[in-house]
């Protein structure tokens, strides 16, 4: 019983901590929902539809979009 109470309190604390330290730039949840709504209207804008760069293709070192996330000297490995 005590362990259950401790676990519940820990989960509540971590949830509150997550919301307290979350990056709330701009409108917070309102901004998130409007972005999701835009992605539903325009499926091509969704990040899930972006193709990853295959091994041996050119990539960006700063923001790699390689399928395995390894970009060395402008090439995915």
Curated annotation (Swiss-Prot):
Propeptide: 23-50
UniProt keywords, alphabetically: Calcium channel impairing toxin, Cleavage on pair of basic residues, Disulfide bond, Ion channel impairing toxin, Knottin, Neurotoxin, Presynaptic neurotoxin, Secreted, Signal, Toxin, Voltage-gated calcium channel impairing toxin
InterPro entries: Conotoxin (IPR004214)
Disulfide bond found in the keyword field: yes
Tissue specificity as recorded in UniProt: Expressed by the venom duct.
CC terms in the record's Gene Ontology section: extracellular region; host cell presynaptic membrane
Localization annotation: Secreted
Disulfide bond as UniProt keyword: yes
Major location category of this protein: secreted
Source domain of life: Eukaryota
Signal peptide: 1-22
GO molecular function, one term: ion channel inhibitor activity
SS bond list: 52-67, 59-71, 66-76
Pfam families reported in the protein's UniProt record: Conotoxin (PF02950)
Function description: Omega-conotoxins act at presynaptic membranes, they bind and block voltage-gated calcium channels (Cav).
Domain remarks: The presence of a 'disulfide through disulfide knot' structurally defines this protein as a knottin. The cysteine framework is VI/VII (C-C-CC-C-C).
Family membership noted in the UniProt record: Belongs to the conotoxin O1 superfamily.
The protein, known as: Omega-conotoxin-like Ai6.2
